[in-house]
Amino acid sequence: AGRRRMQLIYYAIPFFLATIGLEWWLLGRSERKEGTRTELVGFTTKDSFASLAMGVGFLVVEIILALLPFAGLAWLYQFRLFDIPVVWWSWILLLFAEDLCYYWFHRLSHEVRILWAAHINHHSSTHYNLTTALRQSWTTPFTGFIFWAPLPLLGFPIEMIIIQKSISLLYQYWLHTELIGKLGRFGRVFNTPSHHRVHHGRNPIYLDRNHAGIFIIWDKLFGTFEPEGEAVDYGLTKNIHTYNPFRIAFHEWASMLRDAWNAKTWRGRAGYLFMRPGWTEDGAGKTAPALRHDYLLEKQA
């Protein structure tokens, strides 16, 4: 199963490179045609190479550690409730079930700091293009696989799960572009570039919104949906201003562990690991809901 997942990703690499080149050309053509282009952030060389370096690191980690999450899921499969066959309807069922697992993984990766430490690098770019999609985490294999535990316990075969996880990852690639606008009725059900631009925004109104993988219906169902309105300011609430892939990958781990080490109480130490990003022991910190709340109050004033 692990080998099959890697094969799917490897086969997609030429497509990634070709579409990145096409997007770069289209953005450059737009800039040359319009003179000064201010509405799109576009590319910078250093940022794009940092994202590509993160993608290469992700592949290395996947090669080295691929068996860990798969072994865990395979172990859980022996306790399955049902024997789900590999037929057309089970693929449709898995499409929705896996996407729901992804939604909660992604949402909690924004709401629990130790999970955010693994995910933050994907949001660290102040640009939004197809290279941003490749700015993947090097540490998620240690923190993420447990969210897919319900699938083998229900009885989905491991190889089906791994293939569907790969399909979800590949679907999300095209979401990372400024070139595609809103998609009307399609966007009522499916995740789109417009929805995902919101997710990458550091605007207070956009923080921790639109966690969907394939289906945006989960955000609408669980109250985390926000349509694209004001211009998106990409990046983190506190940007890190570095193109060093190792700093991008591990800066939040270092910050989190430093905060926990310096905490005055065990409750504080636990809080710095498991509360929302922005939480502080003295209560002075601002989490995403607090920043959003303050913004809405200010807007209404």
Where are these regions (language model features)?
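Membrane-interface helix termini and inter-helical loops of multi-pass transporters
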Residues: 73-83
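Hydrophobic transmembrane alpha-helical segments in integral membrane proteins
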Residues: 6-16
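Cytosolic-facing loops and C-terminal tails of multi-pass membrane proteins
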Residues: 232-301
